[in-house]
Amino acid sequence: MAEKEQIKLVLVGDGGVGKTTFVQRHLTGEFEPRYIPTLGVSVHPLIFYTNFGKIHFNVWDTAGQEKFGGLRDGYYIQGNCAIIMFDVTSRISYKNVPNWHSDLTRVCENIPIVLCGNKVDVKDRKVKPSQIVFHRRYNLSYYDVSAKSNYNFEKPFVWLTSKLLGNKAVTLVQQPTLKLPETVLDSNLMSLYEKEVADAAALPLPEDNDDL
C-alpha cells in the first residue's frame, strides 16, 4: 500500500449503534465529508499520521440506509477494510453482527475487519466482554470504544493500518484531533473491562455459535 493511496473503509452495523457519532469525532480540518446520493452514503476523510507516513482513510458511513434493509453492493465494492460496530447496551445489535460480516465478506472477501463495541461509557452494559467471541471465530480484531468519550478511538484505525501494511510496528506519531469528550469515563470501570476483554481472549471458544 503506497503512502499516498486513499483507503476505503466500510463502516457497518445496526442503526443507532453510534457509527456516525464515532466517525464525526475526528476533526478533519480542511477535508470535508461528501455525500453520495445514489448510494445514500456519507464519506468521511480521516487522516492519521504514523511512523509509516500519512494514512488517509475514506470512511463510508451508511447515513441511516441500513434502517431500510440491506445495503447495496456498491457500498461495499472496492472496500479495503471495514469496521463492524454494535452497541454494548443492545444485545440485538451484537446478534446481528454475523449478518453484517456475511454481507461484507460476500462482496469484499479477505479484507481486514475490526469489530467495535460502542457505548462502553453507559453503565447499563448488556453485552459483556466474556460474551463477545464472534471476532475470535473469524480472525477479526476487537475493541471496546466510546464515541462520546473518545475512548480507544484510534485503535481500530491503527490495527487496520498495520494489517494493510503487513507490519505490526505501526504507531501514531501524532494523536488525531478529536472533538472534546461529551462524557467522562469511569477509569476503574474501563480497567475492569480491559481485564475482562483480555481474560475472555484466553478462554476456549464455546462450541455453539449462540454467543448471547
UniProtKB/Swiss-Prot annotation:
> Which Pfam families is this protein grouped with?
Ras
Which SUPFAM superfamilies does its entry note?
P-loop containing nucleoside triphosphate hydrolases
**From the Swiss-Prot or TrEMBL record, what is one GO molecular function term?**
GTPase activity
Q: Which GO terms describe its cellular component?
A: centrosome; cytoplasm; extracellular matrix; lipid droplet; nucleus; pathogen-containing vacuole; phagocytic vesicle
Ordered alphabetically, the record's keywords are: GTP-binding, Nucleotide-binding, Nucleus, Protein transport, Transport
Which intervals of the chain are annotated as region Switch-I? 33-41
The keyword Nucleus is assigned to this record: yes
Quote the NCBIfam families the UniProt record gives: small_GTP
- Binding partners and assembly: Found in a nuclear export complex with RanGTP, exportin and pre-miRNA.
Task: Give the protein's biological function.
Answer: GTP-binding protein involved in nucleocytoplasmic transport. Required for the import of protein into the nucleus and also for RNA export. Involved in chromatin condensation and control of cell cycle.
Q: What name appears for this protein in its UniProt entry?
A: GTP-binding nuclear protein Ran
Protein source organism? Dictyostelium discoideum
